[in-house]
Amino acid sequence: SLTIAALALGIGPGDEVIVPNYTMVATPNSVRLLGAKVKFVDICPKTLWIDFQKAKKSITKDTKAIFLVSANGRYPSENIDKFIDYCISKNIKVIEDAAQSLGSYYQDNVHIGLKGNIGSFSFSAPKIISTGQGGALVTNDDELAFKISRIKDFGRSGGGNDTHDYFGINSK
């Protein structure tokens, strides 16, 4: 689901994506698979979240997105809303990798995974809900949701037809 999220946000060659240095390999691989550059940033040892100040200092003109990873339902001690506002001001997309945080909340009672442009949840074997190798993406951006639905179904234009006018993969 992380690769689909990155595809939906238009990440590709020449782009740079900031990723915390404490995450599962699927996070940086989803960026590398699309030909973008991964820039690892240190985490805060107390929360295991990316260090927001170090992430801000790592942003360059090529930075297109940042992955926020919540390990085991932990949340940042810093204000995530201010950090996301900062990303928006720099036109940087935010993907929340909430694979291990289904059902967890931020301090303001918003579910982890619902504050960025896209939230990603995993349903693989060791997770809270397991479907084998499934997952889910969430967004409250209708245009982005439509892109995601097309990408995960071979680029099909919708409605079960055989019109494939958009790049996509088999990830139903």
Predicted segments — roles?
Residues 12, 61, 113-114, 171:
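Structured loop/turn residues at beta-strand edges in well-structured enzyme cores
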Residues 7-98, 105:
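PLP-dependent aminotransferase-like
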Residues 101-108, 115-172:
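Active-site region of PLP-dependent enzymes
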Residues 1, 27, 144:
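Short phosphate-engaging motifs
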Residues 86-87, 113-115:
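Short, conserved loop/helix-junction motifs that constitute active-site signature segments
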Residues 2-6:
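Short, conserved alpha-helix that lines the donor NDP-sugar binding/gating region
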Residues 22, 46, 50, 110, ...:
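Residues at secondary-structure transition points
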Residues 1, 17-18, 123, 135:
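Hydrophobic alpha-helical segments that mediate membrane insertion or helix-helix packing
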